[in-house]
Amino acid sequence: MNELEQLRQFTTVVADTGDFQLMKQYKPQDATTNPSLIFKAVQKPEYRPLLEQAVRDHHGNSGLDGVMDQLLIAFGCEILAIVPGRVSTEVDARLSFDTEATVAKARHLIGLYEQRGVARERVLIKIASTWEGIRAAEVLQRENIRCNMTLLFSLAQAVACAEAGAQLISPFVGRILDWYKKQAGEKWDPVANGGENDPGVRSVRQIYDYYKKFGYATEVMGASFRGTDQILSLAGCDLLTISPELLEQLAGGQSAVALKLSVEQAQAGNVARIAADEPAFRWQLNEDAMATEKLSEGIRLFAADAVKLEKLVGELAS
């Protein structure tokens, strides 16, 4: 068996792409998208018709915002025709600090999916793991609108999401690594900080162990990988969302893949509970320079790509 086949014995494999043609060959269970991936996909000629149809069908009666929503849903529906499981569709990052607007947008997106005959159980609404986003997820989960909490970089965020009853979290492995590498500069030691000692891998393991120790139902899906070594160091995580480039590398790899994370191991560990109320959340996030900086940066990047996508839609509509 290749590395991808072995990994599937321990972990649900998810495709992290808006390029649904590319994901077919890897047979993922679920798929994740974000504004950056959708923007990248619509640059390709084969996806241009989806963009043009969204503009043609909806610009007159629902404006730019409506076209953007319809484009996200169009990609989601195409993906759901390929994967047997779920697709993650992201709420505009510019709503990251507005609980009510996030709830309203999520309800609207789910309504659009349901108009196309897609059951809400097959959709995860991606929301940034700000305090306001987590509160939105708490409301939405009670309505059976399942949430994927993204831009997650710390245990404090993870615990608050689990306490809110979020369906799933997406801790960003690669972006955590990026921060520590940048801080270390020339002193960075790739050997000492590789494999299971990778700071992004350690963060996900800490979160996974906490969840399993205290019996949270929230799923852990590692995301944002820089290489297959990070992925294989998290074999056993509930889910891992992986880019097509790294899926291809795993499919071509022949190394033995060992289980790295397990419920039994987590439950046997010595883990202390942490507070998840608002003052504790804000203080812990403030004290974690990496998480604070990467959360802010991630929101800015996703918002910027949403603006680029809007500009593209606006040019087509004019």
Swiss-Prot record:
Class of this enzyme: transferase
Catalytic site: 126 (schiff-base intermediate with substrate)
Pathway membership, UniProt: Carbohydrate degradation; pentose phosphate pathway; D-glyceraldehyde 3-phosphate and beta-D-fructose 6-phosphate from D-ribose 5-phosphate and D-xylulose 5-phosphate (non-oxidative stage): step 2/3
GO molecular function: transaldolase activity
Top-level taxonomic group: Bacteria
Pfam family, any one: TAL_FSA
Any single Gene Ontology cellular-component annotation: cytoplasm
Main location class: cytoplasm
Enzyme Commission number(s): 2.2.1.2
Quaternary data: Homodimer.
Family: Belongs to the transaldolase family. Type 1 subfamily.
Name the record gives this protein: Transaldolase
The species this protein was found in: Cupriavidus metallidurans (strain ATCC 43123 / DSM 2839 / NBRC 102507 / CH34) (Ralstonia metallidurans)
Gene designation per UniProt: tal
